Amino acid sequence: MTYNNSQQFSAVIFAGGNSTRMGQDKSLMFGGVERIRQLCIDCGVVKIITLCGSEERVSMFEGEVWPDPTHCQKLSDVIRWVRGELPGPIQFIPCDAFDLDRDSLQSLLQSGGGVPLDSNSNRQPLLANCPADYQIGDGSSVNSLFDDLATIVIAGRSDSFSNYNEKSQLNERHQS
């Protein structure tokens, strides 16, 4: 099912990590969560939730902010929990989607569901677009949750779907 109305979506921004490998909190870098929230607003998404990790991080972000439930031990548990809490389609977005722009997000929202490929042809499950009727997988890894979603190839936009886990990746990307 393709959704042409972005208002039908809930956007869920992942901002709960410690970012120790980056040396700073990724949720605050390059405009951070606020930039991603604004992209969602610009695309017409009305329900935007930031998953902040611990309760202590709630005050760091604007809008609707949810701490991770204490029964969730890893990110796959949190994703499974969120899927149970939110009816309708969900667009997931990691806080380190530094290159995501409005046109790329709009393309994801209009994709009908799936997991986009980045510029290295890797599936980026933290940018999954989950249709309302999608049943999250049973595995314990984030990848396994979205195994049954199609791979989305958006011509000319794959750079927008990269994420960054180490400073060296960020340096390489922004020097080219």
Please report, for each region that a protein language model flagged, where it lies by residue.
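Nucleotide and nucleotide-moiety/phosphate-recognizing core
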Residues: 2-123, 138, 147-160, 168
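Aromatic-glycine-rich donor-binding/catalytic loop that engages nucleotide-sugar donors
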Residues: 130-139, 173-176
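Short, basic/aromatic-enriched C-terminal tail that caps enzymatic domains
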Residues: 162-176
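Short glycine- and hydrophobic/aromatic-rich loop-to-beta-strand nucleating segment
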Residues: 124-132, 163
